[in-house]
């Protein structure tokens, strides 16, 4: 990272994030905490834009930043779906959803039921070269043990880099 900081008062955080994002398999996550409204999300967004500028060429090996808001999330499947949509933006398009519904209906008419299959049965959500940012931890509707346990699977079992943003006081 350059010597020029957007946040001179937070240089120690930027320096640590420089160190963390350079690790191959850190085996721990980073928690960025502070009161609501102090700019945690803004800070991490600007930091990531600075160290990983927008990719011009898809063949470049710039890590993909996967930023997920946990606000209102009730299940790990919801998190999986958001991650898959970040990796595969075409999944967000109405045409893709409509095609999926039509395909599912056709299979059901043939006696094949896909209701028990989940999106992550078809897509890998763990990419160690990417950086996962889980924002709004305190606003997640899952029990804290369940949400942190699930996030831990990215770090401990899949060697992913994870930054969690939240307000410990809430």
Go through each PLM region and give its residues.
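Pre-Walker A adenine-sensing motif
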Residues: 7-27
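Short basic/glycine-enriched coil/helix segment immediately N-terminal to the Walker B
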Residues: 24, 117-130
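Walker A/P-loop nucleotide-binding motif
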Residues: 26-45
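P-loop NTPase Walker A phosphate-binding motif
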Residues: 40-62
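A short hydrophobic beta-strand->loop->alpha-helix junction that borders the nucleotide-binding pocket
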Residues: 66-75
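Conserved NTP-binding/hydrolysis module of P-loop NTPases
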Residues: 74-97, 104
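Glycine- and small hydrophobic-rich membrane-insertion segments that are intrinsically disordered
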Residues: 92-121
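Conserved Walker B catalytic segment
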Residues: 125-169
């Amino acid at each position: 990272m350059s010597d020029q900081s957007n946040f001179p008062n937070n240089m120690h955080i930027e320096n640590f994030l420089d160190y963390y994002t350079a690790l191959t398999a850190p085996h721990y996550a980073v928690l960025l905490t502070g009161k609501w409204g102090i700019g945690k999300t803004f800070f991490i967004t600007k930091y990531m834009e600075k160290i990983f500028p927008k990719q011009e060429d898809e063949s470049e090996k710039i890590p993909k930043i996967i930023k997920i808001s946990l606000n209102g999330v009730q299940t790990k499947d919801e998190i999986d779906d958001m991650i898959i949509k970040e990796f595969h933006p075409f999944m967000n398009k109405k045409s893709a959803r409509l095609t999926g519904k039509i395909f599912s209906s056709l299979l059901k008419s043939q006696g094949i039921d896909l209701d028990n299959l989940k999106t992550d049965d078809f897509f890998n959500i763990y990419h160690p070269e990417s950086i996962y940012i889980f924002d709004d931890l305190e606003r997640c509707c899952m029990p804290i043990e369940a949400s942190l346990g699930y996030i831990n699977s990215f770090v401990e079992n899949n060697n992913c880099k994870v930054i969690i943003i939240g307000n410990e006081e809430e």
